[in-house]
Amino acid sequence: TTGILVGIGETRWDRIEALEAIATSHARYGHVQEVIVQNFLPKPGTAMHNAPACPPDEYLDAIALARVILPPEIHLQAPPNLSDDFGVLLDAGIDDWGGVSPVTTDHVNPERPWPALELLTSVTVERGFTVAPRLTAYPEFVCDPNRWFDKGLHFAVMDRSDAAGLGRDDPGAVFPEAIETVSAADGAEVRQVGSESTAWYSGAPVRPVHLV
């Protein structure tokens, strides 16, 4: 992952050169998953707290430049919480919203809350796209673990991803293990598994959920 910050005094040509440098590096190593194009917003207590925010038209132009200059396999990300009208970011060329969370704040920009997932999904679908969860690694990299991951990470990555390399929709996150020791009628102790547990076994009263 790499990226550029737009609106800190650089010129349009500076942005073009930065994006071309990223494209050149990727052509050599094939290692760039995504490029984040972020608009500068002044923050209190910093050296640039009085600097103007990045103009929206310059920001959208930078995103469009990135989409034209970078090869199509490099994903383009922009944070939705730093733009009041984040739908136009899709129009400009992004294909990823980044780490949007319904339970945590943006720790870098806590004053800018994430948009509700329902709104984010609605705006995305209106433009003909689909919202899907992913890991920190993109599907193209997840599906080629021998090249991109240390062997010690293979199980963890594959356990948390689906057949397409996206984030796995695992019912275990909703229904945690529910196992307790009880006494049977004959006095023997047995391990009783709850009806909503993710521990499946022969003769279970419920069928496993299809994850893939």
Predicted features by range, described:
Residues V6-G9, N39-L41:
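Glycine-rich beta-alpha junction loops
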Residues T1-T2:
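Radical SAM/AdoMet-radical enzyme domain recognition
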Residues I16-V212:
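Auxiliary Fe-S-binding modules of radical SAM enzymes
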